Amino acid sequence: MLRKELAKRLKARYDTKMDGSGWLEVSSDGIPLCRIKYNGQFLSNADQNLSDEYRSKIADIQDEISTVREYVGLYEHAPQMKAADVSDYRQLAAFGDTVLAAAYSEKNGFMFCTWKQNADGDSVFWGDYSPNYEYVKESFAVRSGLIPESRLFSEQETANLCRCV
């Protein structure tokens, strides 16, 4: 599951292919960046002459591996949702009346959602769906009240901060 999800997510930005020994090879512009094993083991291109651009891409891939490992690990050990209409989802986290859940399909990969749920957990409502794990974690933190929305930067504020740096 980990390797398939990594391949799906990396395929959008990099050239990927499986080799004969079970490694996912990742390259960009014909330059090999790394190889990833089914369990997330990572071997990067050790060429000392790689440009900063390609080193940045390798760092991006490592971040992607870390993120995918996080949610795949949570998913593999998470209980099924109690609510009948969403029983194909697994509960990754809950706080108060807010739940973060995920569903996986071979064809489409992961879909994440935050819901409000009743006290018994047998009914959910006001779903916020996304395939983006980072977005849904933030949505969960805000919707559950763990982080006040006013403490987050808007896209415009983030852009202004980046221009100042």
What does each model-found stretch correspond to?
Residues M1-S21, A46-R90:
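Negatively charged, low-complexity tracts enriched in Asp/Glu with abundant Ser/Thr
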Residues W23-S27:
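A cross-family detector of function-defining hotspots
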Residues P32-Y38, S44:
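A structural microfeature
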Residues R69-M111, E149-S154:
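Short N-terminal "domain-start" leader segments
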Residues E149-V165:
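Charged/polar low-complexity intrinsically disordered segments, enriched in acidic residues
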Residues G121-Y133, P148-S150:
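A short, exposed loop/beta-hairpin motif centered on an aromatic-Gly-Thr core
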Residues Y38, L100-W126, L161-V165:
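Short aromatic-glycine-(Arg/Gly/Cys) micro-motifs in beta-strand/loop hairpins
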